[in-house]
């Protein structure tokens, strides 16, 4: 078994790496937009941005390959550590009940499940991140086309149009494209893929172990802030064979995307033997779902609702940091004085906005008792240089 906290943060190190990739892509696009000039000659400007478009795809693919190589070993170790942790917890329960379970490393079946889960997750990551090369081209084309349209309309100066284009690509960030056509931000897709992959793989290993040892009952973990559909069965006992008096696998949606072990699910299970003490009482489970979190406006909410609000604050902070990083990159690659002044003004504006957003999040966390999650606020291209500049601008 893995705890909800372990599953919640298992993808953090992988996301850190892919966040660096996202910022590298955003900076690359911002730099290319800045290098194309200010549209004094539309024909020349179009030729320049088409030339940049031609090299953008290959450069993004090179960046993806670089980060994929770095994440492969990290992901392998993550799966191995998760598998060992999950089976050691379960095996202690089996031993306490007179059984002799196999450790992960000596069980061919468990190792095969671990390897299959790792390869599936790694394959999904590779396929998804490769689509960022195409999506980056789309972002670049859309931003340049909109800039040209704005400038040609006469309602915007060329400098304003290009500054807006740089802001647009930063706000969009890097995104992946699924076969269905659905789009997701890169960090969102990575977190979902890794968390789901780890959860499903350790769940399958625990299930295989239970079946081999003849254990029919499993207790499901519980945590505050569970989505409402999962709160209905968390902390309960499930029968693998469908015994009466217990939840069945279909009751918990096992094998479905929005059920137990589905997308982003932080629940796990572990062996339970009739007559053993339960980890969660009915009262304790009720308290996990209570509306006992007070917002600054005095309204009461569940922890799930409060955490969703916290995630919204964090997304806004990351977007602002990406915009500052993109402005910083463009400022380092410009010679047009008017555009420089415009981007300097934008940098000052977003520096103040960042300070305000961080203050709002800190106040919200302090009032609700939630802990700030710095890993969800960080935009990894927003390094020391733009951070120091933002602070300096804010203190002027």
Q: Where do the language-model regions lie?
A:
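N-terminal leader/targeting and assembly helices and adjacent pre-domain segments
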Residues: 1-164, 284-396
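Acidic, glycine-rich two-metal-ion catalytic cores of nucleic acid-processing enzymes
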Residues: 184-287
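Short, exposed beta-strand "edge-strand" segments with a Pro/Gly-rich flavor and a Y/T-containing core
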Residues: 65-69, 178-184, 267-270
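Intrinsically disordered, low-complexity segments enriched in small/polar residues
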Residues: 16, 116, 173-176, 244, ...
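Contiguous, non-catalytic segments that form substrate-binding/exosite surfaces or channel walls
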Residues: 123-213
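Generic detector of intrinsically disordered, low-complexity, polar/charged segments
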Residues: 34, 40, 170, 178, ...
């Amino acid at each position: 078994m893995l705890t909800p906290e372990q599953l919640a943060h298992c993808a953090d190190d992988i996301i850190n790496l892919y966040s660096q990739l996202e910022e590298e892509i955003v900076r690359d696009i911002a730099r290319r937009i800045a290098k194309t000039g200010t549209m004094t000659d539309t024909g020349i400007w179009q030729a320049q941005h088409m030339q940049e478009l031609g090299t953008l795809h290959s450069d993004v693919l090179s960046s993806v390959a670089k980060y994929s190589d770095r994440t492969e070993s990290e992901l392998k170790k993550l799966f191995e550590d998760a598998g060992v942790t999950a089976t050691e917890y379960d095996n202690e329960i089996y031993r306490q009940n007179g059984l002799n379970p196999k450790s992960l490393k000596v069980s061919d079946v468990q190792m095969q499940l671990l390897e299959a889960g790792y390869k599936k997750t790694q394959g999904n990551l590779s396929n998804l991140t490769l689509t960022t090369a195409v999506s980056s081209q789309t972002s670049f084309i859309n931003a340049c086309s909109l800039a040209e349209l704005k400038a040609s309309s006469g309602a915007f100066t060329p400098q304003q149009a290009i500054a807006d284009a740089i802001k647009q690509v930063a706000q969009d960030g890097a995104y992946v494209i699924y076969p269905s056509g659905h789009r997701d931000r890169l960090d969102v897709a990575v977190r979902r893929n890794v968390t789901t992959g780890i959860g499903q793989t350790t769940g399958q290993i625990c299930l295989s172990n239970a079946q081999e040892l003849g254990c029919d009952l499993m207790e499901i973990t519980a945590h505050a802030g569970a989505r409402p559909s999962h709160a209905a069965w968390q902390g309960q006992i499930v029968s693998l064979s469908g015994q009466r008096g217990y939840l069945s696998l279909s009751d918990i949606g096992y094998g479905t995307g929005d059920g137990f072990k589905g997308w982003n699910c932080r629940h796990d299970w572990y062996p339970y033997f009739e007559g053993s003490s339960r980890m969660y009482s009915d009262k304790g489970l009720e308290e996990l779902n209570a509306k006992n979190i007070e917002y600054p406006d005095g309204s009461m909410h569940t922890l799930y609702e409060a955490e969703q609000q916290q995630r919204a604050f964090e997304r806004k902070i990351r977007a602002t940091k990406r915009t500052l990083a993109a402005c910083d990159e463009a400022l380092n690659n410009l010679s047009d004085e008017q555009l420089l002044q415009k981007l300097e003004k934008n940098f000052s504006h977003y520096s103040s906005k960042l300070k305000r957003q961080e203050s709002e999040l800190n106040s919200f966390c302090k009032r609700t008792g939630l802990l700030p999650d710095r890993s969800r606020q960080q935009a990894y291209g927003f390094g020391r240089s733009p951070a120091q500049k933002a602070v300096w601008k804010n203190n002027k």
